[in-house]
Swiss-Prot record:
The gene is psaJ. GO terms for biological process: photosynthesis. It comes from Lactuca sativa. This is Photosystem I reaction center subunit IX. It is found in: Plastid, Chloroplast thylakoid membrane. Belongs to the PsaJ family. It is a single-pass membrane protein. It comes from the Eukaryota. One of its GO terms (cellular component) is chloroplast thylakoid membrane. The chain crosses the membrane at residues 7-27. InterPro entries: PSI_PsaJ, PSI_PsaJ_sf. SUPFAM superfamilies: Subunit IX of photosystem I reaction centre, PsaJ. The keyword Transferase does not apply. Keywords: Chloroplast, Membrane, Photosynthesis, Photosystem I, Plastid, Thylakoid, Transmembrane, Transmembrane helix.
Length: 44
């Protein structure tokens, strides 16, 4: 039961950090490449 409580307290923290960093990454990509349907660093 203690392991379940540990999991339930760790999972929201990790998911918040993950989604927060993902949102920050997407915001920075949109700041440097606004309105990009295809990203310039993938084109040859």
């Amino acid at each position: 039961m203690r392991d379940l409580k540990t999991y339930l307290s760790v999972a929201p923290v990790l998911s918040t950090l993950w989604f927060g960093s993902l949102a920050g990454l997407l915001i920075e990509i949109n700041r440097f490449f606004p309105d990009a349907l295809t990203f310039p660093f993938f084109s040859f």
